[in-house]
Structures are given as C-alpha cells and as structure tokens.
A protein has these predicted regions:
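Intrinsically disordered, low-complexity regulatory segments
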Residues: 1-136, 140, 144, 389, ...
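Structured, charged N-terminal subsegments at the starts of enzyme catalytic cores
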Residues: 227, 232, 236-245
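Short amphipathic beta-strand/extended segments with alternating polar/hydrophobic composition
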Residues: 111, 188-201, 359-363
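C-terminal or mid-to-C-terminal helical accessory/interaction module adjacent to the motor/catalytic core
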Residues: 110-192, 218-225
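Basic, low-complexity terminal or inter-domain segments flanking catalytic cores
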Residues: 1-7, 16-21, 68-71, 75, ...
Length: 512
C-alpha cells in the first residue's frame, strides 16, 4: 500500500479523485490536519536549547497515532504537504516520526502547485527526498526566541514582524484608503486617477472633489499603451476582496483556501504575480469561453525562477460553485489572471500644462476604448476608506513583512493590540511598545536579512544550526548576548513510548 500524506482534511476527497484520474490505485490518503507538533503557547519557559532545537508537543495525538498505524502497513510513503516552508516542516515531522518505527520505509516528497491530475503528474516527475524544513524551522525558533527574550525583559509584546510594523508606521503613517478622481474633459468621459488617502488629507480631498464640476475641462494630448495589471498574489487577492466584495481578510483567506482544496484555484499562499508557460497556456480555453479573443499566454508575466509558487489563477476544473461568495472570489481572481494576457490598453493623457499644479502629478488618464469584454472599468469619484484590516494588510505588504501564509494572523494580532488610531498612526500604547523594543529587533531590515540568509543557506544545503548562526551575525553583540542568556543546555530528545513499542500516544516531547 502506498500512503499519501497531505495537510488539510478538506483535500482528502479531492486528492483521492486526482489519484484515480492519474491511474493510481490502492492508495491510502491521510491528512495531518496541519502541523503535527507545536511549541507551547506560553513563551516561558522558552524551550530552546543551545543547538537551536525547540521543544514541541503533539497538536493532535490521535493524528500521530493514526499516521504511525498506517505507516506500519505501508510499502511506500509519499508526502504531499503544501509546497511551502510550513509544508516542508510538516513533511520533515512526518518523515522523522515514521522513520522511528519504519527506518527502512521508502519516503518521497512531492510539491503540488495545484490539486489537479496534471499538477500531480508534474510533481511526481520531480519527486525527491524529504528535507529538514530548515527555513520554516529557523523562522519558528528565531521568532519564539525573540518573543521569549524581549517580551519579558521589556515588559511589552515584542515580535520580529509586530515590532517592525510599529517601526514602519512610526516613520510613515499608513494610507487609509484611496481617492478616486474624475477630472472633467472637454468632450467625452472624464479623466481618472487613483491616489492613496493619507492621514489628515480627507477634508482637502473632499473639497477638491466637490469643486471638480467648476474646473476648466481639459482635452487629451497624447495616447499611451498601458500594460494590464498582473495576476494576484495572495495578499493582492485579500486586499481586492476586502475592497470590492466586503470580505474580511480572514474570510477571504478562508474562501480562497477552500477553493484551492476543491481544485478550483491554484495554490493560494503565494507572493508571486507570474505564471509558468504551462499554466499560462492552460488559461487559453478559459479566455475563449469568456470572449477574450485578444488573450495571448505569452503576455502573462513569467514566473520568477526563484519563486516556488505561481500567482493565483483558476484551474479550469468543471466544479459547480453554488455559494455566491465563492463565486465572487473565483470571478475576481479569474478576471485578473485572464486580463493579464490581453493586449496593452490605449489611454488618453491630458496635457500637463492645461492642469492646475496640484493635478499634474496624479497620473490622469482615460481608456480610449470603453466598450467590449476587455474594457477596464473605472470607479466613481470619491473617497474610499479602507477597513482597518485592509489598512494593516496593505501596510504589511508594502513593508515586506510577514509571509503569505501568515498575513491574516499578523493582521489579526496587530488589530487586537490596539496600537493604531483612526488616522493610521501609532496610539500612545503603540508608541510605548515601539520605544521599549530594541532597535535591532524592530528594524524592518531584520526580516529582509533573514529571508536573504535563508535563501543563500538553503541553496548551499545548510542546516538549522549554521543558518541560525549566520542570522545571529546580523544582530549587534549586546542583543546576541541577551538572547543567548535565555537558552537552555542541549538536551537529547526524551525516550518515548513510540521508540519502545510504537505507541504514539506515549510521545512526550518532539525536538525539531
């Protein structure tokens, strides 16, 4: 029996279907339900030793028991957890757990970019060994280490992403929404522009919008070709759904994940806005059905060779969607992906000298062609204020903080701390948190340095210890010394019942 291990329970039925379509019979599909092991909720005791191993306990002991029971009967284990760093951590945990009872069992790792037969076939062609999940492990251990060290010593919540966000907002208040401008034209529709709504500017823009009808109309001076917007990343899609469909960041993330698990959308937790040539070609039939005769797969932005995931896009599976909210998600993601393959659209630009000085830098334009299925819709003039979760999401994305898989979590955490006021500035509480956090920890550059080190060390095949040592070298000596004082002496993994008699319920601790 071949045992296939995936993450989400909601994927099991769909995964069984694509195995059958791919001609794979006699397979058992098991879902971990997410992470098998997790660190304690409390940061104290820290539970990290001087080899950078962290103590974790089973999240759901019943899943651990089921997995080991199934593995004892398998002749091959294929780990198909999500194709991201967290999926790699789960894959490493699965392999480590199974190898304790079946050291001779062949174990393979595949990385599916979508839940479809074609994606499965492609992933099987590139299958390989299970790695150590270094990147995900380093982030988990380092973030817990930072929080456990400085939250207690400083008496305020401290975190790599949270504290950096406070630093960013302190320097530059967050945009609160958008201002849509419709500037009068001599003939035909007005010219458009969209600019960020900054703190303290709402009354000024309200007055300007009310005065638009009294402005001297302008004529088009030149015609330019504008490229179509790129397909959505995960964060792009969450922001779009919040603004245009009224879905909270959490709801949007839940719906996108569900549609992925049903085989409707590609892998969701991506920061890419490009597609592979194969995926671009797959969109051609959908474009024809939508009447987009100008669609050309070659126009879609190419996938960055270093990016593990593609932009969000529909898979074209004929799956009935009855829920109106889910329909909206699919429609907006599909439209963005398909329109990215259309020809650049011509726009008319007014002469700068005919505009008042304040309007010359707005980027005013109007579409030359305003009919047809490929037209770009223009919003009505006005001030569009974003919901608080959209404000925070956009701020995180602009600062490069948080990974796609953690964006909803960080948005919720920041809002729960009440560190922002209605103008997108830090509250008194937020300023206290900022002032008590060491500058080296609240520096947004720490995240950029971490990601660069993870990429470089990963390409060299380095493990957790060397990667962590390289990361620590980016911190000032006094910060490193303070962090090192809270580490525990290296301890061997405790002997467990699973090592004696294959009884998973006896696991006490798991050292990652």
């Amino acid at each position: 029996m071949a045992l296939w291990v995936i993450e989400a329970d909601g994927k099991v039925k769909r995964f069984q279907e694509i195995l059958k379509k791919a001609g794979i019979r006699g397979a058992e599909v098991f879902a971990t339900g997410g992470h098998l092991f997790s660190a304690p909720r409390s940061l104290h005791p820290l539970g990290i030793d001087r080899n950078y191993q962290d103590v974790r306990t089973p999240v759901r002991p019943d899943r651990v028991e089921q997995l080991t029971s199934l593995a004892s009967l398998a002749d091959h284990l294929i780990v198909a957890t999500d194709p991201d760093d967290e999926g790699d951590v789960i894959a490493a945990d699965v392999a480590r757990l199974v190898q304790k009872i079946r050291p001779d069992l062949p174990i393979s790792r595949i990385r599916l970019q979508a839940l479809s037969p074609a994606a499965l076939t492609s992933a099987l062609e590139r299958k390989g060994p299970v790695g150590e999940g270094v990147a995900g492990t380093v982030r988990r251990v380092f973030d817990r280490w930072i929080g456990g060290t400085f939250s207690r010593s400083q008496g305020v919540p401290v975190g790599r992403v949270f504290s950096a966000f406070l630093s960013v907002v302190s320097a530059t208040p967050l945009p609160l929404g958008r201002v849509v401008i419709r500037y009068p034209a001599v003939d035909g529709p007005p010219f458009f522009a969209t600019v960020p709504l900054l703190a303290g500017k709402k009354d000024e823009w309200s007055a300007r919008i009310r005065a638009f009808d009294s402005l001297l109309p302008v004529s088009p001076a030149t015609v330019e070709l504008r490229p179509r917007p790129a397909p959505f990343s995960f964060g792009d899609a969450l922001l779009d759904l919040r603004r245009n469909a009224g879905m909270s960041v959490v709801e949007g993330a839940r719906r996108i994940q569900s549609l992925y698990e049903r085989g409707v959308l590609s892998y969701p937790r991506t920061d890419s806005r490009g597609l592979s040539p194969e995926s671009a070609e797959d969109l051609l039939s959908l474009a024809k059905k939508a009447g987009l005769t100008g669609f050309d797969p070659a126009r879609l932005p190419p996938l960055d060779p270093l990016s593990p995931h593609e932009a969000l896009h529909p898979l074209g599976e004929s799956i009935r969607i009855s829920d109106r909210g889910d329909q909206t998600v699919v429609e907006r993601i599909s439209r963005r992906a398909l329109y990215a393959g259309l020809p650049p659209f011509p726009v008319e630009i007014p002469a700068a000298e005919s505009l008042p000085e304040w309007a010359r830098s707005l980027g005013l334009f109007r579409p030359l062609h305003r009919l047809g299925p490929d037209r770009e819709p223009m919003a009505s003039a006005g001030i569009l204020t974003d919901a608080p979760d959209a404000v925070v999401l956009q701020g995180l994305m602009a600062a490069g903080l948080g990974r796609p898989s953690t964006l909803p979590f960080h948005v919720g955490k920041i809002l729960a701390q009440n560190v922002l006021d209605s103008d997108g500035r830090l509250t008194a509480k937020g300023r206290v948190y900022r002032d008590k956090t060491p500058g080296a920890i609240s520096d947004p550059g720490l995240t950029a340095a971490m990601e660069g080190i993870l990429k470089a060390m990963g390409q060299n095949g380095e493990g957790v210890k060397k990667t962590m040592e390289a990361l620590l070298e980016t911190l000032p000596g006094e910060i490193r010394e303070q962090m090192e004082t809270v580490l525990e002496d290296p301890l061997a993994p405790p002997e467990t019942e699973i090592e004696r008699n294959h009884a998973p319920s006896g696991i006490g601790l798991e050292w990652g």
